[in-house]
């Protein structure tokens, strides 16, 4: 969907991450939306992978499978299936339902390298490419591998998900709005009654210094690997 003439997806091909996964040929980012092992990433990432692993900030790899994908918003839900994964009781952040204000500061975490990378910027437009109302335009430095990474505001709320960037315009990046996650779950419930995903509602990052927010968030942002 986002491989248009003026855009490119932000997954990274052909770069071998440091991982126990055998010869992965693609790398992106995802983050937990439920401590039982449910993550959000991009649909364009999931669609090109037959085998998917996710890696946490401790270097632990876990097998994951797609639960649901929505190509219209370029979002997908993954489920960690490895028995070695230990559920996390409570995530310290929440997912924002409402839109951001223009010029609101944001930051993102992702895996353009073999270690997590921080970037900061601001909301530059309330819509995405060609007026897409399901996305934002943000000004922030991202690189291949950032695709699927969380966009957060100063209160530590998830406000978006990195999807693509303009090839010929430095710093012009698009992010799916976090409200799409709620719509995604509604669709999942209609198709998979047995799934129980509880979105986080924590406020543990609010009021923290940015360095402390990032330290806490690192545990919940994963590298997405696969072939």
Question: Model-flagged regions — what are they?
Answer:
Residues 1-18, 84-87, 158-227:
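C-terminal cap/linker of serine protease catalytic domains
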Residues 16-38, 42, 60-63, 90, ...:
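A conserved glycine-rich beta-strand in the N-terminal activation segment of trypsin-fold
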Residues 30, 52, 62-65, 121, ...:
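Small-residue-enriched segments and motifs
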Residues 34, 66-68, 110, 125-126, ...:
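A residue-level detector for short acidic-glycine micro-motifs
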Residues 35-117, 132-135, 144, 191-207:
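Conserved active-site neighborhood of the chymotrypsin/trypsin-like protease fold
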Residues 42-47, 110, 119, 144, ...:
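Short beta->alpha transition motifs characteristic of CBS
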Residues 119-130, 174:
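Short, compositionally biased
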Residues 142-162:
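Catalytic nucleophile loop of clan PA
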